[in-house]
């Protein structure tokens, strides 16, 4: 038994369990065009795969003196997002200026960005119940426009 006789302990089996809260695989492909002087337009696609739900261990979900299994966190479905950007450099009254903008999530896709497993430790359960997983969805289409003047 680990520790001193008057200490509580729990053995947690977690060999081979994936890290939660971070995509294990990401890929990004971007392209930029300069069709004429001062103007740029581009897009990039980011793919998120093998992303697992966040989980945590605490005294409230452990059985002291027992061997517990850490369950494989719930796997978030593969997702991706297409973003677009453009900028134009010009002069206003002899001052350098840039007008630029971004469109994030151009295709307005709703996908699970994060997930949370509230209970991932068990003595006898071998799989996470997907009905108990909380989801956080990505924002839909968003955009911003900027005007920068150097003086």
Predicted segments, located by residue:
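C-terminal extracellular loops and terminal segments
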Residues: 1-80, 137-139
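Active-site phosphate/pyrophosphate-handling residues
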Residues: 26, 85, 142
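A broad, low-specificity signal marking well-ordered, structured residues that form hydrophobic/aromatic
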Residues: 41, 84, 145
């Amino acid at each position: 038994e680990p520790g001193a006789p008057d200490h509580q302990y729990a053995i947690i089996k977690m060999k081979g369990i994936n890290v939660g809260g971070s995509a294990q695989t990401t890929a990004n492909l971007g392209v930029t065009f300069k069709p004429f002087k001062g103007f740029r337009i581009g897009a990039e696609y980011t793919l998120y795969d093998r992303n697992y739900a966040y989980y945590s261990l605490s005294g409230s979900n452990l059985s002291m003196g027992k061997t517990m299994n850490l369950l494989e966190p719930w796997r978030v479905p593969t997702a991706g997002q297409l973003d677009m950007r453009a900028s134009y450099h010009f002069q206003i009254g002899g001052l350098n200026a840039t007008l630029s903008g971004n469109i994030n999530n151009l295709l307005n896709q709703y996908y699970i960005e994060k997930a949370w497993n509230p209970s991932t430790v068990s003595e006898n359960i071998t799989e996470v119940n997907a009905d108990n997983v909380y989801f956080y969805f990505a924002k839909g289409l968003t955009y911003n426009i900027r005007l920068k003047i150097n003086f």
